[in-house]
């Protein structure tokens, strides 16, 4: 999916914030969340609700001025509602996204077959399918369950799940063999093996996660909740002790003023917005077409220190094309060309197809390799080829081909290493071709580093994030591309176990690691990584192992995931700073109202020159309530993220949300006081 597509999705999500249906649903849910069981999950809001009930009891019993008492009670009640509304609107947006996914889940009839080869066919409801069952799906039919293709190849429309209208190719025996229930086969026929129980499919998990049914608080969120609870308890003790202290100076305190002071002291702003921030983080990831299996995954993405990035598709465009044949001395160029083409006829990779194309462009005659035994490429052998008519042709990484030839008792000309280095220094990938015991030469495969990727890595470096390029290329090619792209380190001639070893080494050093993978051989590393981004086009094992799935199957999306995680952490930190900072102005509003009558010197604290003690209390409480809905858009969209160092981010946020959090309430409370005077009189 292009950046434009993702941007459009974000814009549609922002517009949905003000959708009438979402607002109405959130308002209803806000009242439903007044249940004690829900309120107790937020210590701050639970105390505000307790203060609301107590204020109502005091007013109803005649122990306070009725008009003032009911006004305080109403404002406190609205404060709780606004906190509930913030969480409800975040959940409502998630349910809206889930509704589109639910439409993809249909009551389907499956064609269950006996074996991977077919056999007797039985039509059964999709709900009766179990892991291990074989199902046949033909052109125009819907895939009834999650599974792995065991026979055939087909183009599949996954728009109902991923939002991407372009069909994708799925094929047995490749890293693109996974199919998702609810998608539609557009061409050909496949047999797949069911891998998920009914109700536990990929689509079911997406719906549950998006709706928030399985959302658990992240470690940082739990820590912040405990901090808010401790602060609330501390302020509760302080306020409870004030009547005794006031008695020594002959002051009788109005209980309503004490309740107002407590509510203004405790961090109600962040207390009301905290659940919404957590839910919004997962929603923002989904807006980028990334399914996070937990809020923790999004949060950890913002804390990663090391990114392991596959070269192909992430750093380069991933479209390596054969551009030249370089025969060794004594080898005819035509001999190398024809051998490379013959070894590539059954190679389904873009590189293999490009070799055939280049050979034909240079005059090679189209041939068929019927009866040949094709040798597939594996991550362990790192070569492929064909055995046909007494000939054994191999193409692959230089060291692999050298080992193959030497295993047959042959020696390799020193010229080969020079050819390999010559191609590699130019940033291309050398692919060595051998026939039998003889090395014929090198095929040059060229790729292009993505535009703007070097600047992106520079931004990551400024944030203290180390980038490591993973590639199967030889060290010289890897070094050339790493220098061009601006990565900090690279692993050349990498195997799947090398990724796992590097992740463990980084984690042993106390660093958090993120990586991308799509194959079954990537599963151990994806599971080990702190952030494992699996490609939706990959195998079921990879998607199960990772804690995130990119529905667009774009390896470069890992960079966007890091930005979403950073934005999540920055948003929570910024709003916490603002919440604590804006309490300062409330002190200057409430404290003079409590003590100025008995202690005239306390009037000096009335720096805002508020009209009366009761107006001061009402103004502070009204601001305290209104600031929650005012900040909901910021909580849901997130604070704007600008790549920079942690020190620069802290300095910027302290100026905007710290200093701003102190100054804004002074002006707002004074404006509310003037409005109260205009409406109610002095």
Curated annotation (Swiss-Prot):
One of its GO terms (cellular component) is plasma membrane. PANTHER family: POTASSIUM-TRANSPORTING ATPASE ATP-BINDING SUBUNIT. The chain crosses the membrane at residues 15-35, 42-62, 66-86, 233-253, 257-277, 588-608, 616-636, 662-682. The gene is kdpB. It comes from Xanthomonas axonopodis pv. citri (strain 306). HAMAP family: KdpB. Mg(2+) binds at residues 518, 522. It is a multi-pass membrane protein. GO terms for molecular function: ATP binding; ATP hydrolysis activity; magnesium ion binding; P-type potassium transmembrane transporter activity. Belongs to the cation transport ATPase (P-type) (TC 3.A.3) family. Type IA subfamily. It holds the Pfam family Hydrolase. Keywords: ATP-binding, Cell inner membrane, Cell membrane, Ion transport, Magnesium, Membrane, Metal-binding, Nucleotide-binding, Phosphoprotein, Potassium, Potassium transport, Translocase, Transmembrane, Transmembrane helix, Transport. Gene3D superfamilies: Calcium-transporting ATPase, cytoplasmic domain N, Calcium-transporting ATPase, cytoplasmic transduction domain A, HAD superfamily/HAD-like. The keyword NAD does not apply. It is an enzyme of class 7 (translocase). This is Potassium-transporting ATPase ATP-binding subunit. The keyword Amino-acid biosynthesis does not apply. Its EC number is 7.2.2.6. The system is composed of three essential subunits: KdpA, KdpB and KdpC.
């Amino acid at each position: 999916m292009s950046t434009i597509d993702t941007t459009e999705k974000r814009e549609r999500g922002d517009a949905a914030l003000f959708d009438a249906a979402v607002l109405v649903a959130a308002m209803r849910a806000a009242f439903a969340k007044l249940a004690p069981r829900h309120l107790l999950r937020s210590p701050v809001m639970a105390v505000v609700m307790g203060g609301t009930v107590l204020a109502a009891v005091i007013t109803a019993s005649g122990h306070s001025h009725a008009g003032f008492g009911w006004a305080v009670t109403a404002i406190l009640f609205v404060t709780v509602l606004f906190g509930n509304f913030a969480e409800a609107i975040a959940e409502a947006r998630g349910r809206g996204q889930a509704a589109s996914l639910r439409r993809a889940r249909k009551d389907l009839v499956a064609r269950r077959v006996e074996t991977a080869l077919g056999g007797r066919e039985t039509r059964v409801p999709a709900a009766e399918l179990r892991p291990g069952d074989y199902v046949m799906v033909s052109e125009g039919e819907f895939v009834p369950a999650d599974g792995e293709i065991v026979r055939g190849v087909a183009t599949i429309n996954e728009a109902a799940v991923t939002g991407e209208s372009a069909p994708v190719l799925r094929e047995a025996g490749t890293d693109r063999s996974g199919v998702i229930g609810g998608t539609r086969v557009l061409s050909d026929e496949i047999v797949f093996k069911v891998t998920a129980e009914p109700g536990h499919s990929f689509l079911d998990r997406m719906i549950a996660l998006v709706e928030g049914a399985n959302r658990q608080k992240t470690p940082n969120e739990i820590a912040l909740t405990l901090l808010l609870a401790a602060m609330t308890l501390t302020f509760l003790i302080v306020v409870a002790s004030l009547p005794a202290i006031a008695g020594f100076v002959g002051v009788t305190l109005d209980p309503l003023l004490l309740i107002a002071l407590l509510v203004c002291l405790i961090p109600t702003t962040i207390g009301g917005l905290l659940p919404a921030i957590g839910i919004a983080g997962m929603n923002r990831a989904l807006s980028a077409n990334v399914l996070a299996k937990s809020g923790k995954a999004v949060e950890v993405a913002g804390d990663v220190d090391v990114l392991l990035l596959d070269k192909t598709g992430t750093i380069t465009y991933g479209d390596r094309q054969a551009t030249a044949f370089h025969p060794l001395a004594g080898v005819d160029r035509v001999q190398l060309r024809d051998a490379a083409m013959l070894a590539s006829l059954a190679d389904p990779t873009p590189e293999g197809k490009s070799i055939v194309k280049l050979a034909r462009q240079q005059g090679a005659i189209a041939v068929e390799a019927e009866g040949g035994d094709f040798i597939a490429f594996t991550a362990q052998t790192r070569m492929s080829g064909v055995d046909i008519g007494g000939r054994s042709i191999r193409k692959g990484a230089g060291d692999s081909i050298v080992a193959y030839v030497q295993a047959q008792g042959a020696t390799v000309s020193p010229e080969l290493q020079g050819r390999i280095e010559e191609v590699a220094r130019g940033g291309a990938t050398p692919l060595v071709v051998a026939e039998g015991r003889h090395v014929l030469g090198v095929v040059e495969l060229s790729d292009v580093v993505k535009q703007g990727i070097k600047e992106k890595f520079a931004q990551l470096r400024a944030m203290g994030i180390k980038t490591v390029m993973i590639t199967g290329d030889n060290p010289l090619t890897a070094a050339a591309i790493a220098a061009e792209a601006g990565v900090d380190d690279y692993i050349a001639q990498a195997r799947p176990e090398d990724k796992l070893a590097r992740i463990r080494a980084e984690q042993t050093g106390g660093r958090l690691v993120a990586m991308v993978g799509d194959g079954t051989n990537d599963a151990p590393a994806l599971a080990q990584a702190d952030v494992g981004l699996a490609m939706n086009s990959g195998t079921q094992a990879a998607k199960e192992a990772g804690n995130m799935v990119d529905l667009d199957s774009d390896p470069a999306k890992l960079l966007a995931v890091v930005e979403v995680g950073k934005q999540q952490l920055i948003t929570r930190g910024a709003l916490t700073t603002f919440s604590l900072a804006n309490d300062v102005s409330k002190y200057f509003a409430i404290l003079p109202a409590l003590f100025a009558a008995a202690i005239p010197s306390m009037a000096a604290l009335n720096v805002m020159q508020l009209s009366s003690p009761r107006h001061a209390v009402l103004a502070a409480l009204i601001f305290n309530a209104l600031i929650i809905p005012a900040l909901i858009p910021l909580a849901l969209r997130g604070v704007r993220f600008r790549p920079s160092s942690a020190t620069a981010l802290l300095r910027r946020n302290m100026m905007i949300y710290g200093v701003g959090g102190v100054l804004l309430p002074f002006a707002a409370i004074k404006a509310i006081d003037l409005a109260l005077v205009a409406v109610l009189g002095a």
